[in-house]
Amino acid sequence: MLSRFPLFALITLSAPLALSAPALAQQAAQAAPAAGQMNSAQIAAFNQAVTDFTAGQTAQQAGDNAAAAAKYEAALPAIRTAVQADPARIDNVNFLANALYADAAAQGALGRMDKVIALYTESAPYWRKLVEAKPTDAASRNIFAGILIQMGNQKLVGGDKTAADPLYEEALALARKSVAENGKDAVSRNILLSALIGASQTANDPALSAEALTMGKAMLSDGTIDAMNKPSIEAMTGTKAG
């Protein structure tokens, strides 16, 4: 059983956004709430948040995660206000989800893992709403699945299998959809494998353990397994891949 082996797929640092900052910030700026929904000070704060977010992305891409985190933290309150003012405006939901995710990446690079989990937890409802609104957006779906897995890992490390299980199960459904759409995509397959490894330890389902082992062996063999999943599968198989 997989539960005999240590869970190596623990909290890992978020990758920088694939979407360029100027494009996302411009999209968010265009989606700024109308004057009737927010007062002039709130609109000005939102516009400043777009500027701060863009500066944060620039700093993050240059490797200055401390500056990036500071800019993201400065931007977040106004973006939250915009979403609260008009929860149905999906462009602003997208902006908030990505800003929280980018902040988590910067905080993770600084070793502030408690902050990462808090940001992930806050972002999850927005990612869920975004994925539901854009069912063909595989990139957002994969980001959300990865966030759920990290949240599940944190619960599992803390000994709370009951709380971890639904997080893994939701991630598993998302990852299966991505792999069904593009079975050759290594990123999607690694997300699915991570979800299987986690769910195997909370669901008490031998079929999930077997699926994780079979998939992990194949990915070890073809070299597509990532650094997060590799130690878990090596522990399961009792082998050390080159």
Regions flagged by a language model, labelled:
Residues A68, A75, V116, S123, ...:
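Single-residue signature of alpha-solenoid repeat helices
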Residues A62, D103, L110, M151, ...:
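Structural motif corresponding to the intra-repeat A-B loop/turn of tetratricopeptide repeats
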Residues Q37-Q42, R80-V93, R128-R141, R176-V187, ...:
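Flexible helix-coil transition and linker loops at the boundaries of alpha-helical arrays
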Residues A23-A70:
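N-terminal leader/linker segments that initiate helical-solenoid repeat arrays
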Residues Q30-A34, G198, D205-G242:
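Terminal, low-structured helical/coil segments at or just beyond the last alpha-helical repeat
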